[in-house]
Amino acid sequence: KAFHSVRKQGLVGDNFNNKDILSKLPGKTAIGHVRYSTTGESKPENLQPFFANLAIGGFACAHNGNLTNTYSIKKRLVESGSIFQTSSDTEIILQLVARSKKKKIIDKLIDTLYQIKGAYSLVILTNKKLIGVRDPFGIRPLVLGDKSGSPVLASETCALDMIGAKYVRDIENGEIIHIVLISWSKSNCLGINTSRTS
């Protein structure tokens, strides 16, 4: 299954006010992203979500927040042969997931989460799952909503209001929520160091 994308710079209302754009996209699941650039330049190649075709299937990731150890991770990845196409810290997440030796996507993601530090929330779409991740300290928000029986993940409840979805709950600190078809399941990222260093 292929991912289809519409990515534009600017305000959501300016770019997606024509319902024809969204109605032409096939499929029943989607992720969207609105972010002012805090890491990396405001250039078209830095627009999210980011997409990758991994050995285990398609992977799309939208990231809100900042990773604090990007320099050291990126240096290590480049020295081992990785090529970066953007200046966004989100691309580091894709690189780490792609290079993980784990077999399952959730295990690849957990392997990646052990390596990154910072304040973040992630929304990930694969061919079979919608996944939400909140950093171990819960600094960046992520909420679960429901729209007519379909799960929705958003960084703020106002996004739920805009699409007519009902707020269900906040995603917990360090939680990974994976949504498979119509079932919702949860696992926590146990073992991620949540101690603060000065």
Regions found by a protein language model. Give the residues of each.
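Conserved short alpha-helical segments that host acidic/polar catalytic motifs at enzyme active sites
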Residues: 1-173, 178-180, 184-198
